[in-house]
């Protein structure tokens, strides 16, 4: 499981590099922004239930299926730089989905674990719905410029169908009638857990007085 966040950090860096052409830097967007400026889904800022492996696995599954669908919608983007990065990332994301599915399939075979999987699904599903909420008023531009080939509603439907088919096949009850979580995140409205998480996430950068993110290899030597 530890390989997945390492992959995702690498993917994030690819996207940060892609927008540098517009005058942004990874440092300014990530480490030097204020926590209230972030517009991500609140699914990723919720604390894990201590000792609950089901929570981690279900969260990974719900997120990775959404990410897989989003990447599919970017494969034929009108922007070459997006298409190129999508092809690089897609293979690893396919593995992430398979890995999460494999763990869920194994856990539902245990009477105790299946209850924890269901509880995690009930808790996390409303927050997973926030992955398909719009960010500001840019959604119409995303569609108009051909950046994505699917709308958020289409991606949501594809995600829900895929998640429901897999999980109901394991005799899990998918809460498809759940309302989206109160705190969406993509509208800058975060949970109380986000500010302390951001503080921890950026503490090394601040305490070490860094002004440039560390890279393993210079871009010219890749």
Sequence positions of predicted segments:
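Conserved alpha-helical segments that form or flank metal/cofactor-binding pockets of metalloenzymes
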Residues: 2-34, 100-105
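Acidic/His metal-coordination segments adjacent to aromatic residues that form catalytic metal sites
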Residues: 32-60, 110-111, 124-149
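Internal, conserved structured core segments that host functional sites
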Residues: 44-99
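Extended, helix-rich structural scaffolds rather than catalytic motifs
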Residues: 115-222
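Generic structural signal for well-ordered, non-membrane alpha-helices
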Residues: 10, 62-69, 95-102, 126, ...
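A contiguous pocket-lining binding segment that forms or flanks enzyme active sites
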Residues: 81-143
């Amino acid at each position: 499981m530890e390989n997945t966040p390492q992959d995702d950090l690498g993917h994030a860096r690819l996207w940060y590099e892609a927008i540098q052409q517009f005058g942004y830097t990874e440092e300014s967007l990530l480490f030097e922004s204020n926590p209230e400026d972030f517009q991500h889904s609140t699914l990723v800022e919720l604390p894990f239930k201590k000792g609950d492996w089901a929570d981690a696995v279900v969260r990974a599954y719900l997120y990775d299926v959404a990410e897989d669908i989003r990447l599919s919608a970017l494969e034929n983007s009108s922007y070459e730089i997006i298409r190129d990065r999508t092809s690089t990332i897609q293979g690893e994301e396919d593995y992430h989905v398979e890995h999460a599915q494999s763990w869920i399939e194994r856990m539902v075979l245990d009477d105790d674990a299946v209850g924890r999987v269901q509880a995690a699904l009930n808790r996390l599903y409303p927050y997973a719905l926030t992955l398909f909420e719009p960010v500001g008023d840019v959604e119409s531009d995303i569609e108009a410029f051909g950046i994505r080939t699917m709308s958020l509603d289409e991606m949501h439907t594809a995600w829900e169908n895929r998640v429901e088919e897999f999980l109901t096949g394991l005799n899990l009850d998918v809460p498809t009638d759940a309302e989206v979580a109160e705190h969406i995140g993509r509208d800058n409205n975060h949970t109380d857990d986000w500010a302390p998480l951001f503080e921890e996430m950026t503490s090394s950068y601040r305490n070490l007085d860094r002004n440039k993110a560390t890279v393993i290899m210079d871009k010219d030597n890749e």
